Amino acid sequence: MGEKKMKKWVSMGLLACTTLLFAACSSGNKASKSTQETTKSTEVASGASKSGYADPKSLKNNYDVIIVGAGGAGMTAAIEAKDAGLNPVIFEKMPVAGGNTSKSSSGMNASGTKFQKAQGINDSNDAFYEETLKGGKGTNDKELLRYFVDHSAQAVDWLDQNGIKLDNLTITGGMSVKRTHRPSDGSAIGGYLVQGLLRNVAERKIPIFVNADVKDIKANDGVVNEVKVQIQGEKAKSIKGKAVIVTTGGYGASKKLIAKYRPDLKGYVTTNSKGTTGDGIALVEKLGGQIIDMDKVQIHPTVNQEKGILIGEAVRGEGAILVDDEGNRFVNEMDTRDKVSAAINALPKKRAYLIFDQGVRSRATAIEFYAKQGYVKEGKTVAELAKTIKVNQANLEQAVTSWNEAVANKQDTAFNRTTAMDHPLDTANYYAIQIAPGIHYSMGGVKINTNTEVLDKNNQPIKGLYVAGELVGGLHGDNRIGGNSVADIVIFGRQAGQQAAKFVSAQ
């Protein structure tokens, strides 16, 4: 399937970004009627179908590499392992593949890419490193971060070589230049990326078993090389490999873990898919893996509170502003997520409105999905919009006027915003989305080295065990920059597949 056909799936991928109910590693019971109905609807949404997944009857007793979790990191690792000549298998606990990757919105950060150069954007790995380190409050694992930025452009190239082109650029909070790569039409990256990875997995005939609950991971003779998996609720089976890669995502949907590590976040909605419950972290810890930073949970500032739907950072990156219930701006909208969230939580009702015009809507096409969900309020003029959302008309008009002056002068004297100031808000119609903060990402998890090898409590690698994606701890420090998660799963997913292949080949 070519890129042209893939693009036909992008709109469906947007739906997948919010309706897919999966994440990564271990679930359990036989599918109920409601689960079967959910599976059917999510397959339609994502472009996936039962025919695209492996028949449980085809399960073999042995594979070269066993991958637990079919999100972006897991599929990327599988592709690299296959291309290295190995025979990988993927086990996914949910009814469909994709995980939290399917819910990704803004894009993928990378520095010094060919797409940046083509648009005259001057960027460097060092700038990317320093801005990410600042965003993480200096607590990032510096070795992981250095590897991350230095391999980001290669990751964009690798995707492009595999028919997944990300040549439309925007910017996220905490970044100084446009380094957030997204699909050509400016749509959300999640559905597009998942479909591209699924296509590549299918072309290579890599089996993905869904409803496959990995109950345990074992080591034999000092090497991690076996899993116990239960497929579709049937009797669990032991499957042997030569290495295991765990890519099961974080714990942002686990009320139990959030209550344990961040009780202050009780009652917050979550943007995470339902399977993002930290299962893989527990499995790795049982094997002696070192677990770090579990109290570091990111709150995203712009979340729909009814369904926990993330309103992507690209909306602000294309020029939107935030106003309070009185219609006044109150924050630098392009500051880091922790600071913007704190500013919203300091408001009396702990909520705000994204305000934007038709120009922003045309550049950030993910907004069309939000509109279909009923989240977008509209007015032919700013005054009409103020009446619609019931904020002070004079204040909102002044907020927009002042912002447009700041854009014209390239100087925001009110809140010192310096990025995403390319376009004024002056093209009718005008729009608003009510938002508030929600649980979005877990920065804590498994400690690894730059080879994605899991480290034990003595910082020694556990042979045969690799980890990539959101269940890794340390890379993002105290706060993740928007667009770095997708980069993370591709960069370290590739590395996990490559390093596992080297390990297996050396045996």
Predicted regions and their residues:
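An anion/pyrophosphate-binding glycine-rich loop and adjacent beta-alpha core
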Residues: 281-285, 289-393
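Helical element adjacent to the flavin cofactor pocket in flavoenzyme catalytic cores
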Residues: 185-242, 281, 287
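Conserved N-terminal/central alpha/beta ligand/cofactor-binding core
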Residues: 42-56, 87, 93-207, 322-330, ...
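C-terminal motif of bacterial Sec signal peptides marking the signal peptidase cleavage site
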Residues: 21-24
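A glycine-rich dinucleotide-binding beta-alpha-beta segment and adjacent secondary-structure elements
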Residues: 216, 395-479
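Glycine-rich loop(s) and the adjacent beta-strand/alpha-helix scaffold that form part
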Residues: 232-235, 239-302, 495
